[in-house]
């Protein structure tokens, strides 16, 4: 009994290798700074406004039906001039696929990606940032989902295209906190997986209704069903199960 109990504890402490299932990725994941989250608090598509978080960090959200959203706030130091760091705030959303080998491909909606770039030493006006469209597909070689042994939170370890580790992400909301998954730009038309921007008269005629839908979505942002994850209820079950096993093991050793 004691041996079985120790094996169980060891199994719970090990990483849970991710199967290629979208349900595993469902939720909003954020980096350690805990200040960057996807959703309306990062990007306002009506005003086309990127909202700079307090600290750098990254966040990814995934739905179980194949949609994703990314919010990235990155600051890169300049080794030649420490007063000239390059900062970028990037928003994209679209669809994702998980291959049978566990790799993940993110395909953005071309018309919706936005980036705010600050490169003070390589701009005419160092006090002005550059706001532009941004389209960049992303490939992850694989990922792991496991419970962090220190914080007791679900953790997502993503391996980039070259196999290098991305900073770990922690589950913050489930269901995910996201903007609408359809194309948000009401004036430009493009296939949701196009890498080029095209004009289409039929889409322009629907711009008002689409903008209204987006505004209603933003007005209801505080009515979201996304739940902040401070701890996982399944971990409570594991905890009490472990306590029960420990009690049974102790009783067995005592009676023996």
From Swiss-Prot:
Cross-referenced Pfam families: Rot1 (PF10681)
Residue ranges annotated as Lumenal topological domain: 19-234
Keywords from the named record: Endoplasmic reticulum, Glycoprotein, Membrane, Signal, Transmembrane, Transmembrane helix
Major site of localization recorded for this protein: endoplasmic reticulum
Tagged with keyword Coiled coil: no
Ranges of compositional bias, category Acidic residues: 191-200
Record keyword Hydrolase present: no
Any one GO CC term of the record: endoplasmic reticulum membrane
Compartments (UniProt record): Endoplasmic reticulum membrane
Signal peptide: 1-18
Membrane spanning residue stretches: 235-255
Glycosylation sites recorded in the entry for this protein: 81, 101, 127
GO molecular function: unfolded protein binding
Intervals, Cytoplasmic compartment: 256
UniProt xrefs under InterPro entries: Rot1 (IPR019623)
Gene Ontology BP annotations: 'de novo' protein folding; budding cell apical bud growth
Location of region: Disordered: 189-216
Record's bilayer topology term: Single-pass type I membrane protein
Domain of life assignment: Eukaryota
Function in brief: Required for normal levels of the cell wall 1,6-beta-glucan. Involved in a protein folding machinery chaperoning proteins acting in various physiological processes including cell wall synthesis and lysis of autophagic bodies.
Family statement drawn from the similarity comment of this UniProt entry: Belongs to the ROT1 family.
Name this protein carries in UniProt: Protein ROT1
Organism: Lodderomyces elongisporus (strain ATCC 11503 / CBS 2605 / JCM 1781 / NBRC 1676 / NRRL YB-4239) (Yeast)
């Amino acid at each position: 009994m004691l041996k079985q109990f120790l094996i169980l504890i060891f199994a719970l402490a090990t990483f849970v290798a991710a199967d290629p299932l979208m349900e595993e990725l469902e939720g909003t994941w954020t980096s350690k700074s805990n200040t960057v989250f996807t959703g309306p608090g990062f990007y306002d598509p009506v005003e086309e406004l990127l909202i700079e978080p307090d600290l750098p960090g990254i966040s990814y959200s995934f739905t179980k039906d194949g949609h994703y959203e990314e919010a990235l706030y990155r600051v890169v130091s300049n080794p030649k001039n420490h007063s000239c760091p390059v900062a970028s705030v990037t928003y994209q959303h679209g669809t994702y696929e998980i291959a049978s080998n566990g790799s993940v491909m993110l395909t953005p909606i071309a018309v919706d990606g936005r980036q705010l770039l600050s490169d003070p030493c390589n701009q005419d006006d160092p006090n002005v940032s550059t706001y532009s469209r941004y389209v960049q597909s992303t490939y992850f070689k694989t990922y792991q989902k496991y419970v962090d042994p220190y914080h007791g939170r679900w953790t997502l370890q993503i391996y980039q295209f070259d196999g290098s580790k991305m900073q770990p992400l922690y589950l913050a909301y489930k269901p995910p906190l996201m903007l609408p998954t359809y194309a948000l730009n009401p004036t430009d038309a493009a296939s949701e997986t196009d890498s080029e921007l095209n004009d289409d008269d039929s889409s322009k005629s629907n711009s008002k209704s689409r903008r209204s839908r987006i505004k209603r979505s933003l007005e209801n942002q505080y009515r979201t069903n996304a739940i902040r994850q401070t701890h996982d209820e399944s971990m409570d079950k594991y905890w009490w199960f472990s306590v029960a096993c420990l009690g049974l093991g102790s009783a067995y050793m005592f009676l023996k």
